[in-house]
């Protein structure tokens, strides 16, 4: 390349840089400092803060160690599958870290004694039980904009009744009103959620579409807007019961990460939700320990580091509950082998995925 061509290239690049600097200074004068910047200039834009779900397996399945702050998360599933339990666990974890949490109880069904059993400090938890959907979302917007809230839970999207529907007759048709309400609210909320670094969890219910011959007839309420705005979507299902002799003492639960903008999606994790206790930590340590090669299972016997823990899963869980030092050691080794465990959780869109994922 000749010297004349080199000078031309340098002149072009200098002109481009000057034009860019002029554009950036004009934008900052018009909209304020910080309205535009290089992506790596702010650490909090690169490093995502997370809040644990209360489930070690689900934290690993999410790929980043928990639910991302400054983002929208949707948890949906059938009735009594553990949606509110999972949200309350996230609140408890945030409170342990010194955070302030709020719960918008549109269903008017939050049980304070159950929340306390899960580790929630109900004396510090802000709660609102609004009458109309507009009121609920306005309260949520005000709390998020304050910048003082770490976790905000809306339970549930299906219970956010538009005011026009409340004031109308029982048989009136309000086509698309709920979906429009959610779409408008999310357009307003999404910017302030990111700026305030608040985790907003929307709990949602599922419905069946009429006349679907092929594919999955299930859908979530509130239209399509939430599916687009959510960074993480969790499909939670009850897959069985846990019995102590003839008494049912808990549920076996499966969670699928249906959408994940932060890490690879479609990971599936199973854990126990015990009545009055929530997610069983010791049950997870056994299951994940086997996947990570930390806990050995031979027949009905569980053993760790050459020591027999117990015969049968429930006996092994009791042993770990009574020996917290061993439980902590197993947890540390599982966290050390998190990559191996995450690979074992990887599902596919087809296997219990797109075919069974509500649209």
Curated annotation (Swiss-Prot):
Family recorded in the similarity comment: Belongs to the RecA family.
InterPro entries the record matches: AAA+_ATPase (IPR003593), DNA_recomb/repair_RecA (IPR013765), DNA_recomb/repair_RecA_CS (IPR020584), P-loop_NTPase (IPR027417), RecA-like_C (IPR049261), RecA-like_N (IPR049428), RecA_ATP-bd (IPR020588), RecA_C_sf (IPR023400)
HAMAP family attached to this UniProt entry: RecA (MF_00268)
Molecular function via GO: ATP binding; ATP hydrolysis activity; ATP-dependent DNA damage sensor activity; damaged DNA binding; single-stranded DNA binding
Pfam families given in the database record: RecA, RecA_C
Gene disruption: observed consequences: Cells are more sensitive to UV and MMS, and have no detectable recombinase activity. They are still able to generate phase variants, as do wild-type cells, and surprisingly do so at a 10-fold greater rate. Phase variants irreversibly lose the ability to swim, and undergo changes in their sugar assimilation profile.
Primary location: cytoplasm
Keywords: ATP-binding, Cytoplasm, DNA damage, DNA recombination, DNA repair, DNA-binding, Nucleotide-binding, SOS response
Function: Can catalyze the hydrolysis of ATP in the presence of single-stranded DNA, the ATP-dependent uptake of single-stranded DNA by duplex DNA, and the ATP-dependent hybridization of homologous single-stranded DNAs. It interacts with LexA causing its activation and leading to its autocatalytic cleavage.
Gene3D superfamilies, sorted: P-loop containing nucleotide triphosphate hydrolases
Protein name as catalogued: Protein RecA
Gene source species: Azospirillum lipoferum (strain 4B)
Location of this chain's protein in the cell: Cytoplasm
Residues at which ATP binds: 77-84
GO terms of biological process kind: DNA recombination; DNA repair; SOS response
GO CC, any one term: cytosol
């Amino acid at each position: 390349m000749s010297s004349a061509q080199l000078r031309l290239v340098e002149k072009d690049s200098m002109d481009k840089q000057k034009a860019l600097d002029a554009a950036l200074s004009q934008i900052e004068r018009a909209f304020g400092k910080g309205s535009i910047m290089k992506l790596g200039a702010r650490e909090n834009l690169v490093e995502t803060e997370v809040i644990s779900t209360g489930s070690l397996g689900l934290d690993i399945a999410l790929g980043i160690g928990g639910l991302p702050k400054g983002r929208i998360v949707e948890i949906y599933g059938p009735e009594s599958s553990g949606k509110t339990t999972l949200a309350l666990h996230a609140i408890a974890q945030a409170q342990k870290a010194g955070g302030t949490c709020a719960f918008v109880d549109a269903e008017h069904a939050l049980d304070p004694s159950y929340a306390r059993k899960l580790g929630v400090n109900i004396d510090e938890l802000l709660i609102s039980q609004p009458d109309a959907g507009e009121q609920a979302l306005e309260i949520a917007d005000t709390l998020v904009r304050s910048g003082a809230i770490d976790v905000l839970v809306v339970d549930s999207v299906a219970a956010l009744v538009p005011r026009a529907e409340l004031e109308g007759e029982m048989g009136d048709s309000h086509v698309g009103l709920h979906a429009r309400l959610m779409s408008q609210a999310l357009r307003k909320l999404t910017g302030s959620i990111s700026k305030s670094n608040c985790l907003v969890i929307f709990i949602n219910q599922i419905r069946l579409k009429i006349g679907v011959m092929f594919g999955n007839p299930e859908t979530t309420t509130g239209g399509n807007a939430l599916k687009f705005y959510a960074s993480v979507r969790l499909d939670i299902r009850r897959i069985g019961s846990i019995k102590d002799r003839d008494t049912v003492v808990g549920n076996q639960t499966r969670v699928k990460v249906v959408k994940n903008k932060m890490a690879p999606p479609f990971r599936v994790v199973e854990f126990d939700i015990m009545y009055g206790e929530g997610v069983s930590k010791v049950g997870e340590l056994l299951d994940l320990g086997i996947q990570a090669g930390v806990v050995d299972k031979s027949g009905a016997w569980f053993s760790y580091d050459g020591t027999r823990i117990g015969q049968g899963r429930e006996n092994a869980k009791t042993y770990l509950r009574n020996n917290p030092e061993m439980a902590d050691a197993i947890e540390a080794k599982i966290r050390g082998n998190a990559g191996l465990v995450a690979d074992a959780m990887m599902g596919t869109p087809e296997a219990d995925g797109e075919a069974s994922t509500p649209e």
